[in-house]
């Protein structure tokens, strides 16, 4: 029950009492108890985030077969290249467990995360061309959606600072990350919507 409202001068009209008891409209995402204090409400669930801040990048190479700008070979480009300033923060697209942090001459330093959505769907995300000293997670770490995990680099087979971003399905097969993000209604950090 709502507490009794009392006007500063001690009087309260029927009209003002009705306004005092009117439901409150919440425009953001609530957590914990509902506005009435009695029922639980669902917090933002299954929100997928773009890995770089809005307006910070340009997609310079899509998910496709292409001639590698480094090797000159025809290769499957299993992600998208997001050109961005060096050291732009990279965030986890969804909560999960870090399954790999490594470095090689082709990918530079990279992070791969395994995610399990609330419906049980498993997917993996990978973030390449970083510098090892900028990576903020290690294998086995649990990360939250939107958590900073590293920074844009120019390491490995790279012609300029960018994030090579991949999404893999439950069988670890690469899928088009741009289409996948759009299908899963990805938002930028700070643009969450209640569902």
Regions found by a protein language model. Give the residues of each.
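OB-fold (S1/OB) nucleic-acid-binding surfaces
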Residues: 113-122
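Histidine-centered divalent metal-coordination motifs
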Residues: 77-79, 129, 162-166
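Surface-exposed, glycine-biased beta-strand/turn segments
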Residues: 22-109
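Short aromatic-glycine-enriched beta-strand elements
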Residues: 106-113, 161-165
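Short histidine-centered loop motifs in beta-beta connectors
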Residues: 85, 91, 101, 121-146, ...
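N-terminal secretion targeting segments of exported proteins
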Residues: 1-34, 195
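Acidic, glycine-rich catalytic/binding loops that coordinate metals and/or anionic ligands
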Residues: 135, 141, 166-195
């Amino acid at each position: 029950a709502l507490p009794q409202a009392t006007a500063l001068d001690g009087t309260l009209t029927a009209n003002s009492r009705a306004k005092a008891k009117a439901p409150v409209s919440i425009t953001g995402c609530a957590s914990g108890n509902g506005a009435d204090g009695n029922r639980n409400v669902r917090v933002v669930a299954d929100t997928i985030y773009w890995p770089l801040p809005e307006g910070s990048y340009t997609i310079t190479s899509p998910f496709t077969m292409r001639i590698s700008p480094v090797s000159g070979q025809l290769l499957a480009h299993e992600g998208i290249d997001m050109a961005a300033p060096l050291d732009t923060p990279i965030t986890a697209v969804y909560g999960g467990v870090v399954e790999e942090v490594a470095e090689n001459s082709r990918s530079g330093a990279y992070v791969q995360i395994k995610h399990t959505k609330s419906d049980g769907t498993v997917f993996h995300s990978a973030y390449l061309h970083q510098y090892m000293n900028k990576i903020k997670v290690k294998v086995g770490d649990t990360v939250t959606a939107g958590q900073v995990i590293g920074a844009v680099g120019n390491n490995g087979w790279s012609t300029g600072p960018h994030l090579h971003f991949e999404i893999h399905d439950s069988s670890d097969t690469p899928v088009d990350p741009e289409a996948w993000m759009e299908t899963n209604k990805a938002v930028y950090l700070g643009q969450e919507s209640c569902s």
